[in-house]
Amino acid sequence: MSNRSYTQEELADILKGMGVTDQTDVSRYGSGHINDTFKVETKRGVRFILQRINTDIFPDAEMLKDTVMRVTGHLRAKGVPSLEVIAYANPWRLYAFLDGYTSRDVVSEPRQAYDVARAFAKFQNDLADMPPPRLGEIIPKFHDTPDRMRQLDEAVKVNYKGRLANVAKEMAFVEAWRRNTSRLSDLMAAGKIPERITHNDTKINNVLVAADGTAVVIDLDTVMPGSALSDFGDMVRTSSAAAAEDEKDLSKVYSKIEYFEQLAKGYLEGAKFLNDCEKDNLVFSGKLATFEVGIRFLADYLKGDTYFHTAYEDHNLVRARTQFKMVESIEAQEAEYEAIVKKYRG
């Protein structure tokens, strides 16, 4: 979340420009780290979400607006519950508040893994028939793992405060894995894995659920063309993890097979559009997505912690080690994971 503070008067002026003048309370909302988000209460009893887009992360505000408006419009036209944009005044936007929905920050039981996988599979499926033009790439090369490797190689040259001396084991792991990093991009270039519209941030807290089980996928700022496998891989990384992303005790870090099974079951039940090559690479995508985030943390550590917020000196290194341990855990269970995919792939 941005450290920027706003007075009630400033927020009132912004809301006035969007047609809201009867607010009774405007307060910080949610646990996001990128945009500034506020919940707006009004005298009418109507609630809104007011959000300021972080233009450092999303410099092309018009492309972002076009993406969000097209995605939400397409979903709502099909009768699919979605965010409703009330007004835009870049870099600010106003959403209708989704009453009756709740979210979770942690997957605490296997059924929740199933639900999140079904929700994102349905999201991809619902956007599969979006008409041209092609959506813009909000963050170019976001899941281009070879390019992330290039960035790590550059970070090694920076070697902030001689930190490279602390990561010999991690760098050896990276080098052993380097040959795998272009696998999915090569398959896409060869036309074996198609480009699809993907979410690119498939954490459980980006799925809101109503009492009747209706799910709404939120945080649409990274929706853009990509591989469906990037979305599934990140679900494996986040929703099958036994420990937090920055757990220091690596003995607690592993991928839970019962959670992976529910992810695979839910995703394959909902993602009937997947071709055989995509299904063949579902387990690999979990490893690759986790490795990719690991090298991003490692690169940031070697550059002096310039991108990810850190709470202490070696925070990014701890995060990188956790991701690499997750990769090893998935590899250790790979035969079992592949058997699970075979069980549900149809």
Task: Give residue ranges: language-model regions.
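Short secondary-structure junctions
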Residues: K16-Q23, R76-P81, A271-K272
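Juxta-kinase regulatory segment immediately upstream of eukaryotic protein kinase catalytic domains
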Residues: M1-T24
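Active-site activation/catalytic loop segments of kinase-like enzymes and analogous catalytic loops
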Residues: L229-F273, L288-Y307
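ATP-binding glycine-rich phosphate-binding loop
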Residues: T21-T42
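ATP-dependent phospho-/nucleotidyl transfer catalytic cores
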Residues: S2, S27-S31, Q51, T55-E62, ...
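ATP-binding pocket architecture of kinase catalytic cores
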Residues: K43-L135
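Catalytic activation segment of kinase domains across protein kinase-like and atypical kinase folds
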Residues: N205-A244
